[in-house]
């Protein structure tokens, strides 16, 4: 059996287990047996059973079924905590079906939205929507830089923001952070973020840092002027102390291929001097901007 088949069956098992547990709240507990359990710690997987009571994992180990307990055999399959989609654009889709079948079928139980400077509502409003109509997954959000610019600058955004406009954006961001936003996201290759000046970003990242948030960025450039774009992100992290993350880091031009080691060395050097920088990747060569 191929690894892909194992993965597909494991994801299906997770989805089936989630569905069964949700529809059987009256039962004392559910026991998943015979699986190879990967607990998320990085340790090798090992055979174990997992007992779930309502919405809580209460035991992992060598367990025997209890009287009246629902038992899900998972012999030969992999059982793991739900996956976190740390860069999700699901907020551009339809939330009408709050059972989130497409995500659960892939084993995803948490999504992080508001990416690339794009969020569609204040964090308090997002929380209100999902409190009123809960979803089958967990959800976290960043505050999009583009959202802030849209609220403050409207259609007149093809320019740097004025000091008064930056102050207004800072106030909106501070309120979002208090409401639970993870921090500030930017999409500096796209409208409207492409028109922002560095001073604007510095002011906003200072606000995010003060509120305990993070900064995540689709940088200004991922090909010809990649180095300057990365320097801008690192400079924001160094000046404000905020954790900074490069979204989907890549060298998107043939002339830069083969220089990844130098880029990683630059990130390591930045971390060595105290900048809290991280980066994420996706496992394919193309991206939305060039498809």
What is each model feature region?
Residues 12-23:
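Bacterial N-terminal signal peptides
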Residues 125, 161-187, 192-291:
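Histidine/acidic residue-rich metal-binding segments in metalloenzymes
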Residues 2-14:
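Bacterial N-terminal signal peptides that target proteins for export
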Residues 37-82:
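Histidine-rich, glycine-flanked metal-binding segment
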Residues 24-28:
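Boundary at the C-terminal end of the N-terminal hydrophobic targeting segment
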Residues 74-79, 83-90, 96-186, 205-206, ...:
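Divalent-metal coordination cores built from histidine and acidic residues
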Residues 90-91, 221:
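Short active-site segment of divalent metal-dependent hydrolases/proteases
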Residues 58, 78-79, 117-120, 145-148, ...:
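Solvent-exposed loop/turn segments at secondary-structure junctions
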């Amino acid at each position: 059996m191929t690894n892909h088949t194992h993965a597909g069956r494991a994801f299906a098992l997770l989805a089936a287990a989630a569905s069964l547990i949700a529809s059987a709240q009256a039962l004392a507990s559910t026991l998943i047996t015979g699986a190879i359990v990967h607990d998320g710690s990085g340790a090798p997987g090992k055979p174990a059973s997992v007992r779930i009571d309502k919405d809580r994992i209460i035991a992992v180990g060598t367990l025997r079924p209890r009287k009246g307990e629902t038992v899900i055999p998972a012999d030969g399959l992999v059982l793991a905590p739900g996956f976190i989609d740390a860069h999700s654009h699901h907020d551009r889709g339809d939330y009408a079906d709050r059972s989130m079948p497409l995500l659960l079928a892939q084993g995803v139980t948490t999504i992080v939205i508001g990416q690339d400077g794009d969020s569609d509502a204040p964090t308090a409003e997002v929380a209100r929507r999902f409190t009123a109509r809960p979803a089958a997954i967990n959800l976290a959000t960043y505050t999009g830089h583009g959202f802030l610019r849209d609220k403050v600058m409207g259609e007149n955004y093809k320019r740097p923001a004025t000091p008064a406009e930056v102050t207004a954006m800072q106030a909106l961001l501070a309120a979002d952070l208090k409401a639970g936003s993870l921090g500030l996201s930017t999409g500096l290759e796209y409208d409207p973020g492409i028109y922002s000046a560095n001073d604007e970003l510095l002011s906003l990242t200072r606000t995010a840092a003060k509120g305990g948030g993070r900064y995540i960025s689709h940088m200004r450039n991922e090909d010809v002027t990649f180095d300057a774009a990365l320097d801008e992100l690192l400079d924001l992290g160094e000046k404000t102390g905020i954790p900074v993350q490069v979204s989907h880091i890549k060298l998107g031009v043939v002339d830069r291929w083969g220089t990844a080691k130098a880029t990683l060395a630059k990130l390591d050097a930045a971390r060595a001097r105290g900048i809290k920088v991280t980066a994420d990747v996706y496992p394919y060569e193309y991206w939305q901007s060039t498809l």
